[in-house]
Amino acid sequence: MTDTPTHRLLLVHAHPDDESIGQGATMAKYVAEGRGVTLVTCTAGEMGEVLVPELEHLAADKDDRLGEHRKGELADAMAALGVTDHRFLGGFGTYRDSGMAWHEDGHAIPADDIHDNAFWHADLTEAATHLVQVVREVRPQVLVTYDQFGGYGHPDHIQAHRVAMYGALLAGAPSYRRDLGEAWEIPKIYWACISESRMREGLRKLREAGDETTFEGMDPDGPLPPMFTKDEDVTTEVDASDYADQKIAALKAHATQITTDGPFFALSNNEGATAWGREQYRLVKGRLGPMGENGWESDLFAGIEDPG
């Protein structure tokens, strides 16, 4: 145990690519600083849309081999970020991507035809217990996952939120599954977020650049869907601008899911490290560390007196 990093971060995500989009720069920063970073991915993203024409045969309605391919993409993304500890919840293939449909109001909802092994249908206690084993092994001081809406409402994101929160609770219960190791209570839990002001700023730049298709229907001066967080509820912004290039490399590794030649990516590249390197969070358990001039905490590990 002498090689165990003093500070340890655990992230729970639904599909390969979610981690790189949301916290890629934060992950790379903490790895570079010698802090432990563990990623748990709940599914292999089998139901994802394939954006590479020559790989369309991998899709769920064709060869149904996308999950295996995305496993490789995720490994490449983790290599780009420097992360060496990645696990699939319960082991690869335990839970399958549930798929989704779009509601008329613009948020994601469960698809009509869901696979029997879909993560959305997973037994919550069983899935959370898989996470308990990871928590008690890694003993993280910080957990990052989605909010109760799962960000934009994808059923697997919502389920990942439930599993992460319940798993954290069970991991800290001394009488629960002693065979899985000594109880460990995670001191700080964050929900990943994007502030409304930051989203409005990005939307305005997209519209000024003539892009009306990215985030179609959203007006930078109009109401925003609940996937964005009111500024007063944001507690933390990690400035990992020095690691923006690693985040971009990780995004490019998820080639079947993320196109890097569209207007959104081009505009973000023009903004450089500011666009890719600042990642926001909302503390839901634990004590905030020191605040900066912007009124936000700048380090997820801030305020942890005894790393344990």
Predicted regions and their residues:
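Metal-dependent de-N-acetylase/amidase catalytic core
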Residues: 1-12, 109-308
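Active-site rim/loop-helix segments in enzyme catalytic domains that contact anionic ligands
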Residues: 1-139, 271, 282-285, 290-293
